Amino acid sequence: MPNSNRAQPERTMMQAEVRIERYADQGRCVAHIDGRVVFVRFALPDELVRVELDEPHDRDDRFWTGEVVEVLEPSEDRVTPAWPLAGPLAMGGGVGGADLVHVSLPGQLKWKAITVSEQMSRLGHIDVAVPIERMPGDKAAGGLNWRTRIEMIADDNGMPSMRRRGTHNRVAIDTMPLATRTLLDVAKREHVWEGGFEPGSQIRLSVPEPRGEIVDTAAADDNYAVLVDGELRAGSQLLTEQVTINGTTFDYQVDANGFWQVHRQAPIALGTHVINLVNGQLQSAADAVIWDLYSGSGLFTLPLATMTGERTRMLSVEGARVAVKNAQRNLRAMNLNDVDARAGDVSRTLDHVPAHLAKPNVVVLDPPRAGARAKVCRQIAAAGASSVVYIACDPTSLARDTATLIGEGYELKDIRAFDIYPMTHHVETVALFTR
């Protein structure tokens, strides 16, 4: 119901003065103009701001969008952007990649925890408080220097650039504050910031973080990749990632073009939490079946196969064939022969599971942003899994799938968010369901 006490907005051409009401999705907040919902970028709840509406905005539109051009009454969570180029367009910004750059680090945690809780309530039909963890080192770094992968596009002058939000315009950049210092060192050494690229070409840097004495110095020297339009320009096509979980170090061979958790600490944090949840459900059972769905290059597969029961049998399923080849290589390197690693659509693969793997004790799934969807959730339930560990990169998809799993008789036993995307609205969530 509209708030009758809400002050009527003051409008000037395509701008309006509004009071921001609450958090919304995609790093935006909600306000109202003439009774219509407006999703506002670079705002915070309770602020009084001047907003410029995006064009076109028609009277018949269900909602409008806009961006802060002036802050009249700031929130205590507002800060000066640490990366001004990613801030509001009216304040010299406009490139994407850091839509919460105007929010303090504690404010970002609050924003994300509330967003996950609200989505779980609205779409998952369950009220739950969601604790959120910051990654080690992020507070000291001010939320910067965490990305081990970055992507850019060459502008008309061949310089690395990022697109200005909502346009095809390219803004040349000569650094990327969210990137790790290791990545920035590689970019400087390989003369990336000096340009010379074909206009319009896609530029990708993938640079695993060194892992101390474990990394061989000679091998580490070329453990990076500079790719242009998918082709290797410098470094190595196959990269080595090392992840230490509960004292055990795992080596992963990962294609430079493939997916890997982008935050330097995310594989350790997520891997440790997932393994601990699974072991808590198996309770040291010597014989168990585990499914690892949407398994990528095997981030969870390797520790699941080695750190659970002695006779654990596993099925891993991933749609990207290159990632599956990487996972199979990683498994062979550790002599893990009891994992059936398959490439293919998850739902179709689950229709034809071998009998000895058909009844999982625990299912671990890490689906893409769209989520697992109802069919896969129901297939998991039909297989008789007593525990489900769901890793989600989108709280909306998690909430929808939560409703399906609860409808199949599961109960949400544990949920925790991980801030592995500082300065952005993105958040990773891990949920445990049992029945």
Curated annotation (Swiss-Prot):
Q: Cite a single GO MF annotation.
A: rRNA (uridine-C5-)-methyltransferase activity
Binding sites annotated in the UniProt record for S-adenosyl-L-methionine? Q261, Y294, E318, D366
Q: Which domain of life is it from?
A: Bacteria
Q: Provide the alphabetized UniProt keywords.
A: Methyltransferase, S-adenosyl-L-methionine, Transferase
The record places the active site at C393
Using the record for this protein, list the coiled-coil segments as residue ranges, or answer none: none
Broad EC category: transferase
Q: Does the keyword Lipid biosynthesis apply?
A: no
Q: Give the enzyme's EC designation.
A: 2.1.1.-
Supply one GO BP term. Answer: rRNA base methylation
State the Pfam families in the record.
Answer: TRAM, tRNA_U5-meth_tr
Is Glycoprotein given among the entry's keywords?
Answer: no
Entry's family note: Belongs to the class I-like SAM-binding methyltransferase superfamily. RNA M5U methyltransferase family.
Put simply, this protein is called: Uncharacterized RNA methyltransferase BL1394
Organism field:
Bifidobacterium longum (strain NCC 2705)
What is the taxonomic lineage of the source species?
Bacteria, Bacillati, Actinomycetota, Actinomycetes, Bifidobacteriales
